[in-house]
């Protein structure tokens, strides 16, 4: 993107904002925090070719859905849980552009002998998961074990932060996170499996719909694959 910056807005429950420099047309996108690494690459060519000025707000899908319900003016919403968006809100179009799955992650160099889903129940481990109100937490609940969690985080980015800072031994994150963050590694599963999440692009304007279509292009598919996302 032409001039990317990210800041933390505590008043919005830990949302991140990224924007480019001023141009003729402003476009606003709300995006799940798990897209924070890949989305700039996905949008760079579109932004350059169209000349639009894109502002992205990253956060937990529950917080973003609430902002939209309260009337936040946006063009496109990229969510990891479509059920968190009020179905009564009018929209122009909707599509699925990617999928992801959850994985157990540990800090690189961990000596805790963590290797399977049963370790989520181990006494003596410090474990971080997302709160059940956000997609990564909802998916973690579908693993079918009672997780001995020590902390419930507002977004998957918060779980990653706990892991990289060495504050926890084990975290439940998305598979893509272990690819983009070199300080953590996946220990389970070995191959993609559910619980899975689908990323929906919900457009509220014609420009938002155009960007959503760009996200399912062959160019975008190649970028998503590089970051570890699956085809929907």
Language-model segments: which ranges?
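A short beta-strand-loop structural module common to alpha/beta enzyme folds
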Residues: 53-62
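Sec-dependent signal peptide recognition
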Residues: 2-8
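Exported/periplasmic ABC-transporter solute-binding proteins
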Residues: 19-49, 62, 66-70, 79-232
